[in-house]
Amino acid sequence: GIVAAVLYPPVMWLYGFVGVGVLSTSLILALLIWYVFYSRSRVVDVGASIFVALYAGFLPCGFLLVREAVPGFWGGILVLGIMCGVWLNDVFAYLIGRRFGKHKLAPRVSPKKTWEGFIAGMVASVGVWCAIALIPPVDMGFVEASAFGVLCGLAGILGDLAESRFKRNSGVKDSGTIMPGHGGMMDRVDSMIAVSFVSAFLLFGGGCIPYVL
């Protein structure tokens, strides 16, 4: 699963979805062989391997698709803008939630997250996406950008909560100390992973940028 996760981005870049299909098929066949011939293997291990490969390897390819769709300087700016939406969502949610938060968003999964912080993060996400609409190669109005900002904000929160659940199931409080108060670097990465493919799907599906792979 880890090997496949590492291979997904270069395979996507070199061979597109045909290569991804071949890699995914190879992964499933390899896991089936391992499950059949290794007596200590469990179904849950097979499922976990597939999940890790798709979540950590396939989903981040969304940024690659977006970058390839908009060549040159503006492609990098577009990807950076999407990332900024995730970062500002996290920062505003943390700052406003810490200062004004009183209503818990998901107390069993992530006790520190609040509805006040959630709303602040969504506003920040919408603001960034409205700025993204101003990038010349992107064909997107402000209403559409606002909707995309909300959806990507939700995707980021979902990825963040999922990572919090993973940590709790593993008995880990924080996934790092690089960013104090934010739960660790993995919180930022998981939000980014979730937003990566969602943003690509929205931009391509909405006809905002051309699909090239």
Placement of each model-derived feature along the sequence:
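A short, terminal or domain-edge coil/loop segment
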Residues: S49-F58, L161-F166, S196-S199
